[in-house]
Design a protein with these regions (language model features):
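N-terminal helix-cap/turn-to-beta initiation motif at the start of protein domains
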Residues: 2-17, 30-31
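Generic ordered-secondary-structure signal
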Residues: 16, 22, 45-46, 67
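Beta-sheet ligand-binding and adhesion/scaffold domains
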Residues: 1-7, 21-26, 59-96
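N-terminal glycine/threonine-rich, aromatic-flanked beta-hairpin/loop signature
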Residues: 24-62
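A short, compositionally biased
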Residues: 12-13, 33-36, 79-81
């Protein structure tokens, strides 16, 4: 039997679609069948008329929830109105 890591204290208000307020990729946060949380980023290039998807594992440590892009960690934090979510290096997001 496989053992899955269950994360306690995940901010469930983060689940769902988020729009970037400053042109960074829009994101969708979801829980997979394996019980883990993921962030799906979508970026649309108007010049080439193509979209690009990237999926990141969400992990937690003593500093909070984060995604890893290569060697870089981007921390996710709740933000007060009118936005709701802040991702380090990507900026603020509003719930779609």
């Amino acid at each position: 039997m496989e053992e899955y890591q269950i994360y306690q204290g995940f901010p469930t208000e983060w689940l769902g679609a988020w729009e970037s307020i400053n042109g960074n990729p829009d994101v969708y946060i979801f829980q997979g069948y394996d019980g883990n949380y993921y962030l799906l980023g979508y970026n649309y290039d108007k010049e080439s008329e193509r979209g690009n998807f990237s999926c990141y594992d969400m992990n937690a440590d003593e500093n909070g929830w984060y995604i890893r892009m290569g060697m870089k960690c981007c921390l996710l934090m709740s933000e007060s109105s009118p936005y709701g979510l802040h991702i380090t290096s990507w900026g603020s997001y509003m719930k779609s």
